[in-house]
From Swiss-Prot:
It comes from Rhizobium johnstonii (strain DSM 114642 / LMG 32736 / 3841) (Rhizobium leguminosarum bv. viciae). The keyword Secreted does not apply. Residues 73-289 form the Radical SAM core domain. Its cofactor is [4Fe-4S] cluster. Belongs to the radical SAM superfamily. Lipoyl synthase family. Binds 2 [4Fe-4S] clusters per subunit. One cluster is coordinated with 3 cysteines and an exchangeable S-adenosyl-L-methionine. One of its GO terms (cellular component) is cytoplasm. It catalyses: [[Fe-S] cluster scaffold protein carrying a second [4Fe-4S](2+) cluster] + N(6)-octanoyl-L-lysyl-[protein] + 2 oxidized [2Fe-2S]-[ferredoxin] + 2 S-adenosyl-L-methionine + 4 H(+) = [[Fe-S] cluster scaffold protein] + N(6)-[(R)-dihydrolipoyl]-L-lysyl-[protein] + 4 Fe(3+) + 2 hydrogen sulfide + 2 5'-deoxyadenosine + 2 L-methionine + 2 reduced [2Fe-2S]-[ferredoxin]. GO terms for molecular function: 4 iron, 4 sulfur cluster binding; lipoate synthase activity; metal ion binding. This is Lipoyl synthase. It is an enzyme of class 2 (transferase).
């Protein structure tokens, strides 16, 4: 059940996670030293925040409570979250607010494009909340944002991180036709966790979505990510890798799950840096072009640098195949 938030009266007190309010508080584990990050205080961070606020934009960096916000914003990197800040899903791991979203902001595509140009981004990541309330799941809005960025900053490469467009016929095809450079859709966790961690989604639908992207455009880079520390077994992670390689996914990210509040799914374990390195080694052996695996890895962390490495890895693979 999703409790409807008051989107009419802006002064009304908003409960960020109404669907989780009835849950008992979970234990919060002390973070190990390898998880700790510095508080964001730099000039670059302040400048990025000012640009975001000026254009009335939402970032997943803020809404999801990303631990890398200080580092990324200092470098003028930000992941823009389109279609509002209220999601129609209620995933147990996510800090984004749940409820009934507002109407789409028709000026948002141009505002995002202006911010991208002002920040001088060579690579931009665009994500969104789930919009199950929209007939196309927000596909047309994604398309408009991509077009606006192309018009304002033709040299900027575009990476999108999309919802699953569950039960939205034609939505995926429309987004792929807009020609983003990277199509990312996160699996989030292993299939055995879906009922408790990602109840509104379907594991094999997400695998099929990524596979379908390659069928529609074999040249488009595809990417997916998972969190570990949610009680998964190692063999489940390895099977997920196999499922993604069957779908011809190019890039895999693996990061540590961090619990936003006591009402969210608890951290079952803190995976060690050595274990992350092991996952990276195995993933490369399975054929991924790029793997980012570390405690603080997130989907869009170092996205620009990773895109350059991803493109180079494909070129190297093609050259080796031609020899």
């Amino acid at each position: 059940m999703v409790t409807i938030l008051d989107t009419i009266n802006p002064d009304a007190k908003r409960v960020r996670h109404p669907e989780k309010a009835h849950r008992p508080d979970t234990e919060v584990m002390r973070k190990p030293d390898w998880i700790r990050v510095k508080a964001p205080t730099s000039k670059g961070y302040a400048e990025t925040r000012a640009i975001v606020k000026e254009h009335k934009l939402v970032t997943v960096c803020e809404e999801a409570g990303c631990p890398n916000i200080g580092e990324c914003w200092d470098k003028k990197h930000a992941t823009f979250m389109i279609m509002g800040e209220i999601c129609t899903r209620a995933c147990a791991f996510c800090n984004v607010a749940t409820g009934k979203p507002n109407a789409l902001d028709m000026a948002e595509p141009e505002n995002v494009a202006k911010a991208v140009k002002e920040m001088g981004l060579s690579h931009v990541v665009i994500t969104s909340v789930d919009r199950d309330d929209l007939e196309d799941g927000g596909a047309e809005h994604f398309e408009k944002v991509i077009w606006a960025i192309r018009a304002a900053s033709p040299m900027t490469t575009i990476e999108i991180l999309t919802p699953d467009f569950l039960k939205k016929p034609g939505a995926l095809e429309r987004v792929v036709a807009a020609k983003p450079d990277v199509f990312n859709h996160n699996m989030e966790t292993v299939p055995g966790n879906y009922l408790t961690v990602r109840p509104g989604a379907r594991y094999f639908h997400s695998v099929r979505l990524l596979q379908r992207v390659k069928e529609l455009d074999p040249t488009m880079f595809t990417k997916s990510g998972i969190m570990v520390g949610l009680g998964e077994e190692r063999n489940e992670v390895l099977q997920l890798m196999d499922d993604l390689r069957t779908a011809d996914v190019d890039f895999l990210t693996i990061g540590q799950y961090l619990q936003p509040t006591r009402k969210h799914h608890k951290v079952e374990s803190f995976v060690t840096p050595d274990e992350f390195k092991s996952y990276e080694t195995v993933a490369y052996s399975k054929g991924f072009l790029m793997v980012a695996s570390s405690p603080l890895t997130r989907s869009s962390h170092h996205a620009g640098d990773d895109f350059a490495r991803l493109r180079a890895a494909r070129e190297k693979k093609l050259l080796m195949a031609a020899e």
